[in-house]
Every structure is written in structure tokens, then in C-alpha cells.
A protein has these predicted regions:
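S-adenosyl-L-methionine
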Residues: 165-177
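Core catalytic lobe of class I
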Residues: 1-162
Length: 177
């Protein structure tokens, strides 16, 4: 809460194993959940155990501080434009991360760039700072850089930080052209 600006927002992605307790924790910490977005994966990993339905979705919570004067940014028109002129709904359908986005190394929960593109473009403007305290392979940083946002990434795994650094170095070189 301390580093989030009054109009800033927080996005958290999770599976059924954790997202509900995260939602409760957000509310206990006086955050207001703006949206509960379902990412419907068009190519989920197979259900090898065959003891439940195939896990084909993840939930993304979008929240802000629950303060009367806190007005968050939502780039409604841009989201509508990205969705073929129609209102964007809270179910986002798309594939898992493409192999071309994993060239720098593998991360078990790497998100596809199109997913972070929607998140970043929906709730930030050029020059804004995007913080990812679990940056993993750096997808948030890559997309932030592509769209003129500043990025701060944190992770506790050196191997994943190396992957993120390689990806961020490549985007930085491309942007300097």
C-alpha cells in the first residue's frame, strides 16, 4: 500500500489454489477489487492425472486502494479499440506463451505478452512506473518497455533474473534503433 500511488492499481494472477485467499487478503488490507478477469487458455496443458476437469483458466484480480478520492485510470477506449470496437469483457481468451517468447529460457508460469499488453495498456500511460515484485522471466518489463513505461522488476531466483535480463537487454537494443 505504501508504494502504490493513490490512483494506482494492482494486478494479481493466480490459480484456484491461491487466488481466493489473495482476494480476501486484498479486501482485508482495504483494497477494492475492480475486476475479476478470467484468462481462458485455448491450449491448456493436458490433465495427466484424469481425476478432475482440465485446468484451463487463471484468474486475474485488478484492485485499487479503497479510498474515496482514489480514482484509478482505465483506458476504456483503447481497450475497446483493441477488441474490434466492442467493449472488452472480463473473460480473455488466448493461448499459452508462444515458444518465440521463451527464447531466453524457460519459466514455469511465464505469461504471454498479449496478456501483459492488455493489463499495462488498460491501466497505465506512457512514462508511468510498473512494478512487478515477482518478475520471473521479465514479460512485464518487456511489454512495459515496448509501450514507453518505466519498469522495476524483483525476483528471488537468479536463474529467472538472468532470463529477464536477457529479454530486457534485447528490447532495450530494439528501442534504441
Amino acid at each position: 500500500r505504501r508504494v502504490l500511488k493513490p490512483g494506482g492499481t494492482i494486478w494479481i494472477s493466480g490459480t484456484l489454489h491461491s487466488i481466493y485467499s489473495i482476494g480476501v487478503a486484498l479486501q482485508q488490507e482495504l483494497y477494492k477489487i475492480i475486476n475479476n478477469i478470467t484468462w481462458k487458455k485455448t491450449n491448456p496443458p493436458p490433465n495427466l492425472a484424469c481425476r478432475c476437469f482440465t485446468h484451463s483458466t487463471e484468474t486475474i484480480l485488478w484492485a485499487r486502494k479503497d479510498e474515496k478520492k482514489a480514482r484509478h485510470l482505465f483506458n476504456y477506449e483503447q481497450m475497446k479499440q483493441m477488441n474490434g470496437g466492442k467493449q472488452m469483457k472480463d473473460v480473455w481468451e488466448g493461448s499459452l506463451t508462444r515458444p518465440s517468447e521463451k527464447w531466453a529460457g524457460r519459466h514455469p508460469t511465464q505469461k504471454p505478452e498479449y496478456l501483459l499488453e492488455r493489463i499495462i495498456l488498460a491501466s497505465t500511460k506512457k512514462g508511468d512506473v510498473v512494478l512487478d515484485p515477482f518478475c520471473g522471466s521479465g514479460t512485464t518489463g518487456v511489454v512495459s518497455g515496448k509501450y514507453g513505461r518505466q519498469f522495476i522488476g524483483i525476483d528471488n531466483n537468479e536463474e529467472y533474473l538472468d532470463i529477464a535480463k536477457r529479454r530486457l537487454d534485447q528490447i532495450q537494443e530494439a528501442l534504441e534503433w
